[in-house]
Amino acid sequence: METASGPQEKYQLITRNLQEVLGEDKLMAILKEREVKIYWGTATTGKPHVAYFVPMSKIADFLKAGCEVTILFADLHAYLDNMKAPWELLELRTRYYEHVIKAMLESIGVPLEKLKFIRGTDYQLSKEYTLDVYRLSSVVTQHDAKKAGAEVVKQVEHPLLSGLLYPGLQALDEEYLKVDAQFGGVDQRKIFTFAEKYLPSLGYAKRIHLMNPMVPGLTGSKMSSSEEDSKIDLLDRKEDVKKKLKKAFCEPGNIENNGVLSFIKHVLFPLKSEFVILREEKWGGNKTYTAYETLEKDFAEQVVHPGDLKNSVEAALNKLLDPIREKFNSPELKKLTNAAYPNPSKAKPAEKGTKNSEPETIVPSRLDIRVGKVVSVEKHPDADSLYVEKIDVGEPEPRTVVSGLVQFVPKEQLQDRLVVLLCNLKPQKMRGVESQGMVLCASSVGEPRQVEPLDPPAECCAGERVYVEGYEDGEPDDELKPKKKVFEKLQADFRISEDCIAQWKERNFLTKLGSISCKSLKGGSIS
């Protein structure tokens, strides 16, 4: 990584794309004498999303400017903020953040050896730090503490004392990390000015504060971990990235509150110094922009179409996400992710036989059904009636699926076809080949038996979820236990309607693009 030379060049790198700097003169004075020490902290709460690339790209700028950069995993802050991270999950979430932030930095080419990583609890539970918390609490008013956290700490009618402590701890971090400057979003401004007011009262120096703008989410508001359509998760599949970008607010010619343009400005341009608009030759072919202002001007004048802008962002974003997805595909990190962010709907069942135990709920949302694309079909080496298919369901590798369709569907009709796959059956070997799912098909009633694979809408992507109308919000089981016979109990009410639509209890099987159907077997069963 090349570094800037000279105080002015370093200053430009440190401050580019920032919304505000408190302490500009002090920053320049330090740059004339030595390298600047900066820290960025992140509370280990919800899953990081693609907006985290905004601070990551600035951290890359800081390193190019020769700064000494510390990344703080603020685990104690995560607990203090209205218990956004429960105490029992604190360690797991901190480990998750460490892995995902490092994967993001590696994805954009930041050398990790140039960074210092530290957890809040490594020093915030020390005797000295704790004494300073008490000293600070003796001079800070309740009004100032509440005001400082208003944009950051979760606001409730009756705030907990922990939320009032939060700004003071963040202020003390500047002293205990021995930095010249703290970097964060402009939503942290009140905490930064709080620190500037109160640290000197303890005899500590006032620090420089560097503030990023808040990047609009895809809906045009702040990108939020709690608004599913507003954010793109770092581990989202390519199909989900496409789907969320497709929904993004990006009105032709409108450059105000445009989350897609904002992401290009604050993430993609700083990382590559250029951005390529991908489009067909008949629309002018690809065009490379070396200045964001030129791209914004062309979009405002409708020279660049929103569809081309979204497709180009999708391609660039997936290049950043691919190495992160690959890293988190390991069994260890999959296990960590599930442990750090357990499914809240999966409450611990009552003890069997206790008076609080209830019959298990059998609902279709427990089935993990997805659209799949058949990428290859071969005859089973040891069974004439079976196919062995490779089916893409939006995972890093296609699944191997064994199907008894040889007598009903010619091989060439399966190749490259979209199918509907049940993905959470327990894998089982069929004549020596492990099958990792089941292709759902319509079957005729009576003889001669006819079988047709179910058809999703033609525009669907591999991996897209299939659900039953009215049950779209439930979470599927990780794996269906054979002894529970969940699928078998639900399957008893699967039917093909008179309109050839797949149904459960007269409720349609759906994707976001429409109904699941079959070609002709009205009134048939589904298996």
Curated annotation (Swiss-Prot):
Placement of sequence motif Nuclear localization signal: 242-247
Enzyme class: ligase
Comp. bias intervals (Basic and acidic residues): 348-358
Database matches in Pfam families: tRNA-synt_1b, tRNA_bind
PROSITE patterns xref list: TRBD
Keywords linked to the UniProt accession: Aminoacyl-tRNA synthetase, ATP-binding, Cytoplasm, Ligase, Nucleotide-binding, Nucleus, Protein biosynthesis, RNA-binding, tRNA-binding
GO CC entries: cytoplasm; nucleus
Enzymatic reactions: tRNA(Tyr) + L-tyrosine + ATP = L-tyrosyl-tRNA(Tyr) + AMP + diphosphate + H(+)
Motif ('KMSKS' region): 222-226
InterPro entries from the UniProt entry: aa-tRNA-synth_Ic, NA-bd_OB-fold, Rossmann-like_a/b/a_fold, tRNA-bd_dom, Tyr-tRNA-ligase, Tyrosine-tRNA_ligase_regulator
Record-annotated disulphide pairs: none
Motif residue range(s): 'HIGH' region: 44-52
EC number: 6.1.1.1
Subunit structure, as described in the record: Homodimer.
PANTHER family: TRNA-AMINOACYLATION COFACTOR ARC1 FAMILY MEMBER, TYROSINE--TRNA LIGASE, CYTOPLASMIC
Xref: NCBIfam families: PRK08560.1, tyrS
Similarity comment: family membership: Belongs to the class-I aminoacyl-tRNA synthetase family.
Name the UniProt record assigns to this protein: Tyrosine--tRNA ligase, cytoplasmic
Organism annotation: Gallus gallus
